[in-house]
Amino acid sequence: MTMNEQNVLNYIEYNKEEFIKISHQIHDRPELGNEEYFASSLLIKTLYNEGFTIERDIAGHETGFIATFESEHDGPTIAFLAEYDALPGLGHACGHNIIGTASVLAGVSIKEYVEAHGGTIKVYGTPAEEGGVNGSAKASYVKAGLFSDCDVALMIHPGHESYRTVPTLAVDVFEVEFFGKTAHASENAHNGINALDAMISFFNGIAQLRQHIRKSDKVHGVILDGGKSANIIPDYTKARFYTRAMSRKELDVLTGKVERVAEGAALTAGAEYKLNHIQNGVNEFIRNDLLDDLFERHARKHNETILHDDFGFGSTDTGNVSHVIPTIHPHIKIGPSSLVGHTVEFKDAAGSAHGDHALIQGAKIMATMALELIDNPDELKAIKNLHTVLKGKVYDHQ
């Protein structure tokens, strides 16, 4: 271990209780996507007090921020991705209190080194990773070109085991609405246009579609509004749907098929329909083995047992970042192997001593990774060259 690494690790150890407190404060005050006013303000205050320049209200996300610390000397730009939104009804059952705090701690811990040796640190506060209306802020940031001056992006995610970056699926989230004509269901049903019939036809059509799509494709949804009274022909219904696929290219095809099912269902019932995307489209993750190798080496230095897994069925807007710069999204263990995300048990683990340990471990790993990338321009160049190759490939999963 180099003297520079030891200095950074000493900083993290000395200040860890302060950052554990921040994580607990965010955990105890969960906020939904694009409503994370407390969490974002707390992280911004911490970064500002450490001498970072703060930009707020990023790319249409009021609770987004970019915190920058720039050396007078040339060097690479290292991005740390901070998440801090919670889940409806469950709170921090995905551990974003750990993610956001670990990224901030990693960023501030290398500030003195960057100031002396060159480079730029950027901590991106990224709201609404869990989605929802105007969700997946990282996709907005990518569209706005906000990562164009970055060399790599680093983050860690709590999990039931410690993993390298796993595959993720591209996802679209949209609402389907049907518009009919109200009528009394007994006296003059013949004058009505039943929007619920259209919705039921739509769901039946999706069930039939599933036998003609790839095994890796996913279509799932719920009815949000099915009408108000059983003796009135519903003139309006609404459902929310997710479509997922192994790549953006495949997902565009799948979502197009779902829209044609909606069109057919409307035609069958004599209704009109609308399909509205309510959040940013999320892309699959482009995994960079060289960057993950670097993560694994540094994780093992800190006594983490790292597993490899090629079966991932979730989605994250960090995938969008991976389409523009080399990015990692590894997991750090916070509880037993039986732990499952988006559960009360995971929420409890995210606020436990195990979660605190993962926060500090994640910050140490990301910080020492960043030092190696700054110190070794040839290694960074190889990682970026591999990303260019991977980005140019067309994935065709059968």
What does each model-identified segment do?
Residues 63, 68, 85-93, 97-98, ...:
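Histidine/acidic-residue-rich, glycine-tolerant segments that coordinate divalent metal ions
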Residues 79-81, 174-175, 179, 329-335:
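Non-cysteine beta-strand/loop elements that form the S-adenosyl-L-methionine
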Residues 27-29, 85, 92, 96, ...:
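Histidine-centered active-site/metal-ligand motif
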Residues 2-122:
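Acidic/His- and Gly-rich active-site-bordering loop/insert found
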Residues 28-29, 122, 129-131, 180-188, ...:
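Active-site-proximal beta-alpha loop/turn segments in soluble metabolic enzymes
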Residues 26, 67, 80, 96, ...:
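Divalent metal-coordination and catalytic microenvironments
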Residues 200-398:
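Metal-dependent amide/peptide-bond hydrolase catalytic core
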Residues 2, 6-9, 13-20, 33, ...:
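Electropositive phosphate-/nucleotide-binding environments in soluble metabolic enzymes
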